[in-house]
Every structure is written in structure tokens, then in C-alpha cells.
Regions:
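N-terminal Rossmann-like NAD(P) cofactor-binding subdomain of oxidoreductases
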Residues: 1-90
Length: 90
């Protein structure tokens, strides 16, 4: 399963990542997603370094599941775009 965490660089996104790690949530691929200004930032999850990607790129990656922890406006704009490509949006 390809999992996207939208808003990964924010406070809530960081907490979601902690919960995913604590509960050993199963996934094959992880996409850390944030605003375009945060794209390119490096983050570590479970000892592996990830590069944060922007929302547009994340939609094109067609994740199976996207967990949104971004602000309301961002979620209202982008959640439907993820759903349109078949992503389950949480």
C-alpha cells in the first residue's frame, strides 16, 4: 500500500507519523507531503530519510490512502483531487 501523509511537516503531521511508527502501521511506500515551499525538505521516519513532496506531485503518485493533517482550506481544495485518482482520503 502506498500511504501519503499530507501536512507531514506540521505539528499534527508529526504526531501522525509518531502514531504510525508506534503501531507499526503497515505500508509499502510512504509519501511525505506538504506545501510547495516545504517540498524538498528532508525528514526521517523509522531511520530512513524521505524527501517531502508537494501536493501536485503527490496526487500524480496516486497513493492508495492519504491521511490529511493539513489546514481546512488545503484539505477542502486537495482531498477531492486525491479522491478523483482513487485515493482513500482520511
Amino acid at each position: 500500500m502506498k500511504l501519503a501523509v499530507v501536512g507531514a511537516t506540521g505539528l499534527v503531521g508529526s504526531e501522525i507519523l509518531e502514531v504510525l511508527e508506534e503501531h507499526q502501521f503497515p505500508f509499502d511506500e510512504l509519501l511525505l507531503v506538504a506545501s510547495e515551499r516545504s517540498a524538498g525538505k528532508k525528514m526521517t521516519f523509522k531511520g530512513k530519510e524521505y524527501t517531502v513532496i508537494g501536493l501536485k506531485q503527490a496526487v500524480s503518485e496516486k497513493p492508495d490512502v492519504a491521511i490529511f493533517s493539513a489546514g481546512g482550506g488545503t484539505s477542502l481544495e486537495w482531498a477531492p483531487q486525491f479522491a478523483e485518482v482513487g485515493t482513500i482520503v482520511i
